[in-house]
Amino acid sequence: MRISVSTAGILPTDAAAVVREHLAPILGTWAPHSRVRLTRLTEPGLLRPLVAQIDVQLSGGHRVRAQVAAATMSDLVSLLATRTIEQLHLFPSVLAECLRQQVTTLPPPSPPELLPPAGRRVTRHKGCHPTAMTAAEAITVLEAMDYRFHLFREKYSRQDSIVMRSGPGRYRIFQSRPNPLGLEATSPPIALAVAEWSTIPQAVARLDLTGAPVDIFTEKFTGRLHALYARFDGHYALLGSTAPVTNAHGPW
C-alpha cells in the first residue's frame, strides 16, 4: 500500500506524515495506491482555507475520491478520514471488518465558500468530451468521485447531460433539449430538467446574485452544455462540453 501526499502552500512540516498515519488503517491492502493533495489557499477572508483531496485506486480497477475543506489541520485530517470511510462504503468489501458496520453521521459536504461578488473571477476554463454512459452509470461516477455534478453523454438519447443531486437519494439531469429516452426505468427516479440558454456573463451574474454553488446552462452562441461552479478558493470555474453540436439553433 502506497499513500502519496503532495502539498501546496504553508502547511505544518508533519502534515504528510499525519495524513498517512490516519489513512493507512482505513485503506488497508485493498487500496494499492492512494494520492492525497493538501493545499492552503491564499485568498484572504476564507473561513476554510485548508483543502484536502484523496484519490484512491482500489484493487479491481475501482476508484473513489473525496474532497474536504476545514479551518484547521486537525479538523482537515479528521474530516478527510471520515469522508474516505464514507466513500469506501460504496465498495464495502475493501473496508476492514470493524469499519464496515460504522455508520458515518456527517452531513453532506458543504459547498465551497465564495468571496464577495466584487472579488470573484472565472479563474479556470475546462473543456471535455463527455463519455457515453447510462444515467445509472453517471450516478455511480458522481458518487464514487465525490463530484457535485457530472458531465456525460446519455447513451440512448445521445445528448450531452449533467447529473446532480437534488436531495438524499434523488438526482436531476440537465439537458439542452430534454429527452426522457434512457431515463424511464431508472432507480431511483431521475428528474429531467432543461439547461436554459444563456451567455457566460449571464451565468456569472446569476451566481453573483444567488450565491448558489453551481449554474447549469446551454451556452447561447455554441449550443454546448456548461456548468459554472464555485471553487474552494472562492472564485468560479467553467466546465463545458467540447463534443460536436448537431443542432445549435437556440431554444424552441
PLM regions and their residue ranges:
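N-terminal, polar/charged subdomain of small-to-medium soluble alpha/beta proteins
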Residues: 1-252
